[in-house]
Amino acid sequence: MILTVTLNPAIDVSYPLDELKCDTVNRVVDVTKTPGGKGLNVSRVLNDFGETVKATGCVGGESGDFIINHLPDSILSRFYKISGDTRTCIAILHEGNQTEILEKGPLLSVDEIDGFTHQFKYLLNDVDVVTMSGSLPAGMPDDYYQKLIKIANLNGKKTVLDCSGNALEAVLKGDSKPTVIKPNLEELSQLLGKEMTKDFEALKEVLQDELFEGIEWIIVSLGADGVFAKHKDTFYNVDIPKIKIVSAVGSGDSTVAGIASGLANDEDDRALLTKANVLGMLNAQEKTTGHVNMANYDKLYQSIKVKEV
């Protein structure tokens, strides 16, 4: 079983408009609302793929109830209730652009943070892999993921971390390391304080930096150019075919789902990397975020090329 952690989920609201007019009224006909947050995207893709998945995080108010009530029944919902209201994130789709308005989210108390930590320990009992995705809510310290990873490691669980900024930096500088991190080039550049490109030799060099010591897998997303990965002392380039992209939103989360599934099933390096990339591509072919059409899985799987470099 795989446990997904989404500490700062949201209701994602989509407003499609032919044209966004400023300083006047814009009327929307086709409004969609879905449970949002990177970890919930991971949950839905794992569910589509047929994995047993348990979802947790912090939710509150009517928005939190909406998230719990609108997840597929086959996803085990184990969310921790807080006093604040779960946030709403608005995406305005207009003229080929996407303008986002993101709420910060609720402020958690010390007691609520302690309560979630206790629940997290309990939820580890029957899982093999834990994914941790997205931003931390207000009130949680930057090193909170580090705390969860330490608990998971002590219980012999594999962990996949997908976050950025101070939260990721705190984990890299901490004592407890995740099994996998999945930065993109922009996040890697931010961490290292220098611009990183798709140059394989440069990537090889930086991924051996002491900052990443103790992390078994480092999987760097190159967007439409695939992935550059380091597993222990071996480096891989994953070459993916060109596809028609409907929406790339959530494709990174779908890749995380593939990584988690690969770890849970003890797959070899090539199988794990191939599965992860296929799920990311399948999500990009769908209008709905965090959804994959498994009818296209086998064909894409055969088109992925994993090369040791």
UniProtKB/Swiss-Prot annotation:
**What is this enzyme's catalytic activity, as reactions?**
D-tagatofuranose 6-phosphate + ATP = D-tagatofuranose 1,6-bisphosphate + ADP + H(+)
Q: What class of enzyme is it?
A: transferase
Query: What's one GO BP annotation on this UniProt entry?
Result: D-tagatose 6-phosphate catabolic process
Taxonomically, the superkingdom here is: Bacteria
Q: Which GO terms describe its cellular component?
A: cytosol
UniProt key word Kinase: yes
- What is this protein's record name? Tagatose-6-phosphate kinase
Q: Which organism is it from?
A: Streptococcus pyogenes serotype M12 (strain MGAS2096)
| Taxonomic classification | Bacteria, Bacillati, Bacillota, Bacilli, Lactobacillales
- Gene encoding this polypeptide? lacC
